[in-house]
């Protein structure tokens, strides 16, 4: 409305808009108005040169989007805000969003669903409220929790899952969850059990979008080598010769936290807990002052602890649009979906490239067969642990290793529970033979990167 309009004129204009509304199904819900979905109908109620060969234009596809299709968005940050907006305006009206984070003032420059008054509130709840208020008829249901806190029944209800995450671990866990929902009959995959995963990621002016059909195409773990490893600083530098503010934060995170246990025994440092970050920040300042290092800030501390990646709003918009387009293609079957990996880069000019990521036959996540591990009988369990964490195809974080000996389950090593870690630590220095393991022995490995236990088959070599 033009600025300075008289109240009476404003009122008349609002009444005119209301008169154009069409009651949807006689329910009294004025969430539909004449021509609201014309932009979507142009794609679904006529054919064109790019439509899927088997697509038949009809009104049913739009009704499926509006009334039936359920979409799960993981993450309500930079990508997530864009995704929620794009999906809601594309006709998807049944959306759930999961995010465990709260709004920080640094989010406001690019996460446009949030306002200064929202700082400190859960991202999922604020984003859902904003979209529900702004897009009539759309129902966004928020879940302020970790993805690991939701069970199989929850995930099974959705037609498509779309991720806007900044964590490789969370991506892998979500990938593993959708793989665990697959149903096989006599070794043949039941297509109706497949829940497509659309994954987007950004880093500065670079981004990617991919389409994953669990059990059919390359999964996250099949292409794990594509994700850059986290930057780690040498321990000797952190402990004795710090030169950067990041060194001070890493010193507190890696050495002081487990030593001083400021919040009790067994409490893991949580990058989303303000009390934890404040403690690390204060200790980092003390460490920096000791070595005359400047530049330690609260924001830097949180960035180092959470491994925060720089974000650019325009990149988020492009990748979210690509992901939302793929969701639309798959939900309606109107167009052939991406096959299956899109790369975007606008550092120098504009560059995009699409290629087909290939599925790994021996992928530890989706291959359905135990992966071979080759060691000598004299190799120590520590070497197996190093293999699980350092191998580019596995990149596990805190693997727990169990096996079956004499018909009983035996935990060889588990580091996430302090009492069990202390009891099983001596096993790390023992050889595989001393532990009673034999050629062909199956090892079950659990890790934070997957909701499933991963099976490995031990193969002794000379």
From Swiss-Prot:
Sites marked Determines specificity for nedd8: 210
Any one GO molecular-function label of the UniProt entry: ATP binding
Region feature Interaction with ube2m N-terminus, mapped onto this chain: 52-69, 156-160, 191-216, 330-337
Catalysed reaction equations from the record: ATP + [NEDD8 protein] + [E1 NEDD8-activating enzyme]-L-cysteine = AMP + diphosphate + [E1 NEDD8-activating enzyme]-S-[NEDD8 protein]-yl-L-cysteine
Region annotated Interaction with nedd8, chain positions: 226-228, 351-356
Record EC number: 6.2.1.64
Transmembrane segments: none
Note: Arg-210 acts as a selectivity gate, preventing misactivation of ubiquitin by this NEDD8-specific E1 complex.
The protein, known as: NEDD8-activating enzyme E1 catalytic subunit
Species: Danio rerio
């Amino acid at each position: 409305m033009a600025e300075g309009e008289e109240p009476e004129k404003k009122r008349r204009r609002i009444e005119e808009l209301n008169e154009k509304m069409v009651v949807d199904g006689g329910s009294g819900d004025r969430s539909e108005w004449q021509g609201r979905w014309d932009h979507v109908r142009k794609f679904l109620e006529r054919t064109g040169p790019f439509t899927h060969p088997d697509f038949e234009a009809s009104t049913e596809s739009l009704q499926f989007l509006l009334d039936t299709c359920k979409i799960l968005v993981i993450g309500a940050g930079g990508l997530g805000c864009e995704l929620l907006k794009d999906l809601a305006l594309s006709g998807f009206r049944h959306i759930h969003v999961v995010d465990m984070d709260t709004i920080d003032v640094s989010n406001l420059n690019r996460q446009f669903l949030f306002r200064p008054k929202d700082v400190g509130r859960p991202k999922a709840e604020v984003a859902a409220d904003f979209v529900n208020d702004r897009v009539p008829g759309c129902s966004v249901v928020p879940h302020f929790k970790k993805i690991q806190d939701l069970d199989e029944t929850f995930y099974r209800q959705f037609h498509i899952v779309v991720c806007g995450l900044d964590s490789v671990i969370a991506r892998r866990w979500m990938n593993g969850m959708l793989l665990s929902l697959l149903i096989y009959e006599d070794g043949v995959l039941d297509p109706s059990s497949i829940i497509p995963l659309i994954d987007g990621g950004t880093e500065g002016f670079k981004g990617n979008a991919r389409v994953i059909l669990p059990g059919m195409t390359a999964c996250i773990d099949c292409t794990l080598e594509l994700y850059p490893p986290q930057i780690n600083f040498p321990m000797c530098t952190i402990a004795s010769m710090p030169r950067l503010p990041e060194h001070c934060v890493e010193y507190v995170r890696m050495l002081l936290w487990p030593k001083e246990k400021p919040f009790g025994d067994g409490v893991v440092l949580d990058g989303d807990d303000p009390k934890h970050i404040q403690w690390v920040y204060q200790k980092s300042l003390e460490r920096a002052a000791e070595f005359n290092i400047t530049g330690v800030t609260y924001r830097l501390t949180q960035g180092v602890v959470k491994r925060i990646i720089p974000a650019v709003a325009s990149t988020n918009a492009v990748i979210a649009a690509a992901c939302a387009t793929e969701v639309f293609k798959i939900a309606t079957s109107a167009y052939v979906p991406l096959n299956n990996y899109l790369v975007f880069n606008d550092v120098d000019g504009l560059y995009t490239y699409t290629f087909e990521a290939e599925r790994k036959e021996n992928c530890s996540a989706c291959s359905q067969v135990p992966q071979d591990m080759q060691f000598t009988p004299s190799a120590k369990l520590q070497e197996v642990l190093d293999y699980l964490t350092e191998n580019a195809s596995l990149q596990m974080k805190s693997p727990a290793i169990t096996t079956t000996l004499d018909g009983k389950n035996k935990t060889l090593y588990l580091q996430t529970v302090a009492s069990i870690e202390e009891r099983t630590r001596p096993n790390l220095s023992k050889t595989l033979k001393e532990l009673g393991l034999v050629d062909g022995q199956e090892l079950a490995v659990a890790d934070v990167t997957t909701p499933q236990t991963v099976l490995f088959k031990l193969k002794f070599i000379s």
